[in-house]
């Protein structure tokens, strides 16, 4: 135990000041395998890959000093979220453990190989924490004085910091927010708050805990986006597609088989020819088929964020249903537990 304590004290001096990668927990999980020469794969999103690379070196050093053999690999492909599990990709390697950084386990995506999820909580010093929490409290009080309730949303990295505000945890593909008159998203970037804005079709305030600045996604921006998507749907009404590509992601947390089957049934009922396509990573360069458009049965953000990159029109399942119903009442598509 003394050796382990001294080792962790040394690690703490070197470890990143931005994210808590829970080195001790990872080492303990590997040791608990109680296996000679265990195989462990580390998986992380792009923003954490270089930090995890350094983390691997520290963990290798620990086991080397204990004279324990271990095989460690870094997953080099994508990691879009807890939906993007790799157990099916690596099962032929007889892997004992996967360390997945940056996300929490999804109830509808269960890995078949033992997987440890490390949230990678953001680390702030005391002054930074105080500044962040006071800024949020002042925002809440300001709107409370006007008779409005503020709902706080954030990503997993700030869950621990904001625990006293009981925040909703937002995923890229889902935007469930507790009831409130005003929504404040705490986090970096616009990817996650856009999800909330699209779903609730109302402005979302943003507080960036790194820059300590406020921003917002306006109703004007949301309405502009919805108009673009309705225009895309209306083009289907003007030129009814003769053949449609129906793309189903094979990623465990995006493989919405029930939705896929529902779309196929609707196409058959409406006498529309279709080509079912199975894909892991959906991107513009692999959708080159002789179809008029594609229905993307996967993460809805592929359509909502990247539609302009595709040569042929792409639609979410909900958008294509609007076309079949001849409706212009836009309905946002998001992944739900009963999609699988």
Curated annotation (Swiss-Prot):
[4Fe-4S] cluster binds at residues 83, 173, 299. Pathway: Protein modification; peptidyl-diphthamide biosynthesis. It catalyses: L-histidyl-[translation elongation factor 2] + S-adenosyl-L-methionine = 2-[(3S)-amino-3-carboxypropyl]-L-histidyl-[translation elongation factor 2] + S-methyl-5'-thioadenosine + H(+). It comes from the Archaea. GO terms for biological process: protein histidyl modification to diphthamide. Keywords: 4Fe-4S, Iron, Iron-sulfur, Metal-binding, S-adenosyl-L-methionine, Transferase. Its cofactor is [4Fe-4S] cluster. Its EC number is 2.5.1.108. One of its GO terms (molecular function) is 2-(3-amino-3-carboxypropyl)histidine synthase activity. Binds 1 [4Fe-4S] cluster per subunit. The cluster is coordinated with 3 cysteines and an exchangeable S-adenosyl-L-methionine. Catalyzes the first step of diphthamide biosynthesis, i.e. the transfer of the 3-amino-3-carboxypropyl group from S-adenosyl-L-methionine (SAM) to the C2 position of the imidazole ring of the target histidine residue in translation elongation factor 2 (EF-2). Unlike the enzymes in the radical SAM superfamily, Dph2 does not form the canonical 5'-deoxyadenosyl radical. Instead, it breaks the C(gamma)-S bond of SAM and generates a 3-amino-3-carboxypropyl radical intermediate. Belongs to the DPH1/DPH2 family. Homodimer. This is 2-(3-amino-3-carboxypropyl)histidine synthase.
């Amino acid at each position: 135990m003394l050796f382990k304590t001294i080792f962790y004290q040394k690690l703490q001096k070197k470890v990143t000041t931005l994210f808590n990668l829970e080195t001790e927990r990872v080492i303990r999980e590997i040791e608990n395998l109680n296996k000679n020469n265990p195989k462990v794969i580390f998986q992380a999103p792009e923003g954490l890959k270089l930090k995890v690379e350094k983390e691997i070196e520290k963990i290798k050093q620990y086991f080397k000093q204990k004279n324990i053999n271990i095989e460690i690999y870094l997953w080099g492909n994508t990691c879009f979220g807890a939906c993007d599990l790799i157990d099916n990709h690596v099962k032929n390697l007889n892997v004992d453990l996967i360390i997945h950084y940056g996300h929490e386990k999804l109830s509808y995506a269960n890995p078949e190989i033992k997987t440890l999820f490390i949230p990678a909580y953001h680390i702030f010093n005391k002054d930074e924490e105080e500044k962040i929490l006071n800024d949020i409290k002042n925002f809440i009080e300001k709107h409370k004085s006007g008779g409005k309730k503020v709902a706080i949303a954030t990503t997993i990295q700030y869950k621990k910091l904001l625990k006293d505000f009981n925040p909703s945890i937002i995923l890229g593909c889902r935007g469930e927010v507790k009831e409130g008159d005003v929504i404040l998203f705490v986090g970096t970037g616009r990817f996650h708050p856009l999800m909330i804005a699209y779903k609730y079709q109302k402005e979302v305030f943003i507080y960036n805990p790194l820059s300590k600045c406020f921003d917002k996604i306006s109703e004007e921006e949301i309405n502009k986006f919805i108009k673009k998507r309705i225009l895309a749907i209306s083009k289907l009404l003007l030129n009814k597609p003769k053949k449609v590509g129906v793309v189903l992601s094979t990623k465990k947390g995006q493989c919405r088989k029930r939705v896929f089957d529902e779309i196929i049934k609707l196409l058959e009922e409406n006498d529309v020819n279709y080509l079912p396509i199975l894909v892991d990573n959906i991107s513009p360069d692999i959708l080159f088929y002789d179809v008029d458009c594609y229905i993307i049965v996967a993460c809805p953000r592929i359509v909502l964020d990247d539609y302009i990159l595709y040569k042929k029109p792409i639609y979410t399942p909900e958008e294509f249903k609007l076309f079949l119903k001849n409706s212009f009442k836009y309905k946002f598509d998001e992944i739900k537990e009963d999609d699988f």
